[in-house]
């Protein structure tokens, strides 16, 4: 039976101590594209967590039967199957969100976080640990998306999840929206400040 302390570490260390975006600087492209709204960031975060977790689980199950020469192909096939399933479910049950996410759900296949956990962890560890590690890393990625999306949507439009938080000048309120935060460069700045803040708080994460 897996050690609960280790499982807890695998699940929660990617949130702060080993965050895929803040420490490993992975998955940046989709973080720029899907964080203009909190709703799309939530769906993307959940999608990545599920794909990363279950792809690691299935890859771990068959790891001893995969010839080394084709392991990347097998990993990609498993990941692509899960991404296709997620994409089809979104189109079936959340079509408008699927349109907003556009090609970025499909591009989960090429996300370095998913491939990285499959190659670095799932190919060496048992299925349960691989599942927890994958979900943890996907959730850590999703957490960063939520923070970035909250800042961008709130400052950029004065709303969160479509609900008005700050009454804008256009609607007779006091808040003047900042259109810069609805553009991709703002995500770079926010992620940069988050990385700076995290490494100031935890100096051991700073690069030598």
Swiss-Prot record:
Pfam family, one: Rnf-Nqr
MF terms (GO), sorted A to Z: oxidoreductase activity, acting on NAD(P)H, quinone or similar compound as acceptor
Swiss-Prot/TrEMBL catalytic activity: a ubiquinone + n Na(+)(in) + NADH + H(+) = a ubiquinol + n Na(+)(out) + NAD(+)
GO annotation, biological process: sodium ion transport
Top-level division of the source organism's lineage: Bacteria
Signal sequence bounds: none
Compartments where located: Cell inner membrane
Main localization of the protein described in the UniProt heading: membrane
Topology in the lipid bilayer: Multi-pass membrane protein
Matching InterPro entries: NqrD, NqrDE/RnfAE
An annotated GO cellular component: plasma membrane
Spans through the membrane: 42-62, 72-92, 103-123, 131-151, 178-198
EC number: 7.2.1.1
UniProt keyword annotations, A-Z: Cell inner membrane, Cell membrane, Ion transport, Membrane, NAD, Sodium, Sodium transport, Translocase, Transmembrane, Transmembrane helix, Transport, Ubiquinone
Family: Belongs to the NqrDE/RnfAE family.
Subunit structure: Composed of six subunits; NqrA, NqrB, NqrC, NqrD, NqrE and NqrF.
Task of the protein: NQR complex catalyzes the reduction of ubiquinone-1 to ubiquinol by two successive reactions, coupled with the transport of Na(+) ions from the cytoplasm to the periplasm. NqrA to NqrE are probably involved in the second step, the conversion of ubisemiquinone to ubiquinol.
Protein name (record): Na(+)-translocating NADH-quinone reductase subunit D
């Amino acid at each position: 039976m897996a050690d609960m302390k280790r499982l807890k570490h695998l699940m929660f260390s990617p949130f702060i101590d080993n965050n895929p975006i803040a420490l490993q600087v992975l998955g940046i492209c989709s973080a720029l594209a899907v964080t203009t709204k909190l709703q799309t960031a939530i769906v993307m975060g959940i999608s990545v967590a599920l794909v990363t977790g279950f792809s690691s689980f299935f890859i771990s199950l068959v790891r001893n039967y995969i010839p080394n020469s084709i392991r990347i192909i097998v990993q990609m096939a498993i990941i692509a199957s899960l991404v296709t399933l997620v994409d089809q479910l979104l189109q079936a049950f959340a079509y408008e969100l699927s349109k907003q996410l556009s090609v970025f759900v499909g591009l989960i296949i090429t996300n370095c976080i998913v491939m990285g956990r499959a190659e670095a962890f799932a190919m060496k560890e048992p299925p349960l640990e691989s599942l927890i590690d994958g979900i943890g890393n996907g959730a850590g990625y999703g957490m960063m998306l939520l923070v970035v999306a909250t800042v961008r949507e709130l400052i950029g439009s004065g709303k969160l999840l479509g609900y008005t938080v700050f009454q804008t000048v256009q609607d007779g309120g006091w808040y003047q929206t900042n259109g810069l935060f609805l553009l991709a460069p703002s995500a770079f700045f926010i992620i940069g400040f988050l990385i700076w803040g995290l490494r100031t708080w935890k100096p051991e994460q700073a690069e030598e």
